[in-house]
Amino acid sequence: MKVYAFGFPKIGEKREFKKALEDFWKGKITENQFKEEMSELRMYMVENYRTNVDVVPSNELSYYDFVLDTAIMVGAIPERFGKYEGLSTYFEMARGRKALEMTKYFNTNYHYLVPEIESGNFELLENIPLEDFLFFRSMGIETAPRILGPFTFLYLSKKDGMWIREPGEMEKLFTRLVPVYRKVFEELVENGCGEILVDEPAFVCDLQKDHWNLIKDVYSEFSGFPLTIFTYYDSVSDYESYVSLPVKGLHLDFVSNTENLRNFEKHGFPSDKTLIAGVINGRQPWRANLKKVAELVDKLGASAISNSCPLFHLPITAQWENSLPDGLREKLAFAKEKLEELKVLKEFFEGKKVNLPEVSFEDFAVDESVSKKIKQLTPDSFRREKEYQERDRIQREELKLPLFPTTTIGSFPQTSDVRKMRARYRRGEISEEEYESFIKEQIKKVVRIQEEIGLDVLVHGEFERTDMVEFFAEKLNGIATTQNGWVLSYGSRCYRPPIIYGTVSRTGPMTLKEITYAQSLTEKPVKGMLTGPITIMGWSYYREDIPEREIAYQIALAINEEVKDLEEAGIKIVQIDEPAFREKAPVKKSKWPEYFEWAINAFNLAANARPETQIHAHMCYSDFNEIIEYIHQLEFDVISIEASRSKGEIISAFENFKGWIKQIGVGVWDIHSPAVPSVDEMKSIIERVLRILPKELIWVNPDCGLKTRNWEEVVPSLKNMVDLAKKLRKEYNNT
């Protein structure tokens, strides 16, 4: 039995990656010092592999993003960045003023930089995999370089602002891209490399027959090289074509789907290739039931095993988690522990006496009263009492808002003072009373500022919240937060996903104190601010033995209890943030109807409010076209969307959807940029929207929360936004 593993987190046990990268950006360390620290992290990653697996991967530590590294390797550098000058160009592409677009990697919480293919004149600019291979070779360590495959690279790229997905377009680009990959492989083999690991996760997407013909042509060009292909996140879309590729070995993910196993049983597996069975879950942090896993490996007759997908979706180790609920830590396996599980499986198949644990979750942290509530749900639980048109009439009478009402998305700048006070409170250096008094002062200040600016619907600023998911996770039963469970989101940004380990329920009000205090300071409506069930679930780890639908409904019930408390306290507008609604959708569109059915139900269960309560939904996407029909089924009254980057073009999704009647908060200010938008810039976006939607449906707001901006940017931008609304009212009030 041979053990492969891949994607070990580069972050470091003490987030050394983040510190070194940010120190380099700030000029605190030189380029050489930065590279030395990265080399130490490389060695740390490889030592973890060497202890547990047979095939040690290299080329796994990117200075920012592995897709960007691939773009550099093949010379896909847009003209605006000029001649490639090493790290200065690299980080300009990653985070400069004209940086590449960033988006989610398949349906995960990792973000990658989208390559821009301009001329299609690829060249081998820098053989990064070879450099890493030779680095380890100089240390006496043999590795198998890991490379993003050519098909996935193009599939994740854009040309002229459009995704490169059409087979004819891909074929043209492959004529120039394939020779570059050949050169990379040739140089590796010439230097004694015995195996090259090629990641092709795009093979699991909705591909046509023409795509697979193209894939076969591409890989026939590589038939002499020792390639092993890795696929993950779902089943390969054409099993028979996949297993016929002329390569040394093929990895299949047997965790995320059932189709790979069904296809294996139906079509078998070629005897001239190595089957690498991805049987240890790389996305969820639970210890595997190794007895069951061993039975599956036996059934497959696999001669090699691995994790199902990259381990960078997990924290490094559960070893230092000392404040988790009783009985939880021993059920956890982070990246290091996953490698150990693979080693135990290998020893078992080699006939060594090892214990294959059977982890049981059956009765762990279960609350039957919540299960009972879910069983009692009826179709009316997922529908509001009155239809939208009737709710709209009631709400307009109740709220008496002007035309083009203005608001923000929720958070305001979290200054270093706010972060310091929160840290002091968590360390026990100040009392709860002192901390709450400080938060009240911040709320009072932000309400005053919003009133002075002239916003119509106010927010409390979210100064008490570190993170929109972690805040609720800390207040709900059945969800744990970690001390050191850091995962990389993009660049140097890390977050700690909460762990949904039991039945989720609410212990008491979570947001009431701060929101009702803010409302007491003003006559204007203050929005209640909640995170939706799909986002809490999608940005957390959760149990594998409980259906996703049930977990989502548990969270939705808890959020709905909060909505009802806010209503009782006189709050007339409640916003439910659901940025994960689209991104949690399965990779394959054939699985969308089932997912969206329960995702829509979960939102509607959470949002089941009185007719006079105006429910806002916030979703920060730039592409609604694919999911507009599903969004239309959500029971909100107003949806706020990003519109600034697309200059209002996002609204075409609503133009193409006949029968749209709900209100839309148009994000006219791109908060990801430090620039203060002018009234005219923002007006052009609203005018684009007014070509399609009636003026009565339009709100004016930033496209996202303002937590990461500073006050010097926020105040003038919001003033311009309010001036815009006043200008629009003058212009359109009598039309």
Curated annotation (Swiss-Prot):
EC id: 2.1.1.14
Free-text remark on how the cofactor is bound: Binds 1 zinc ion per subunit.
Residues at which Zn(2+) binds: 618, 620, 642, 704
Cofactor: Zn(2+)
Annotated GO biological process: methionine biosynthetic process; methylation
Keywords: Amino-acid biosynthesis, Metal-binding, Methionine biosynthesis, Methyltransferase, Repeat, Transferase, Zinc
Pfam families, A to Z: Meth_synt_1, Meth_synt_2
Residues annotated for L-methionine binding in this entry: 409-411, 462, 577
CDD domains (UniProt xref): CIMS_C_terminal_like (cd03311), CIMS_N_terminal_like (cd03312)
Active-site residues, record numbering mapped to chain: 672
Pathway: Amino-acid biosynthesis; L-methionine biosynthesis via de novo pathway; L-methionine from L-homocysteine (MetE route): step 1/1
Catalytic activity field: 5-methyltetrahydropteroyltri-L-glutamate + L-homocysteine = tetrahydropteroyltri-L-glutamate + L-methionine
Enzyme class: transferase
GO molecular function, one term: 5-methyltetrahydropteroyltriglutamate-homocysteine S-methyltransferase activity
Binding site for 5-methyltetrahydropteroyltri-L-glutamate: 15-18, 104, 493-494, 539, 583
Binding of L-homocysteine, residues: 409-411, 462, 577
Family as reported in the entry's similarity comment: Belongs to the vitamin-B12 independent methionine synthase family.
Primary role: Catalyzes the transfer of a methyl group from 5-methyltetrahydrofolate to homocysteine resulting in methionine formation.
Annotated protein name in UniProt: 5-methyltetrahydropteroyltriglutamate--homocysteine methyltransferase
Gene source species: Thermotoga petrophila (strain ATCC BAA-488 / DSM 13995 / JCM 10881 / RKU-1)
Upper taxonomic lineage: Bacteria, Thermotogati, Thermotogota, Thermotogae, Thermotogales
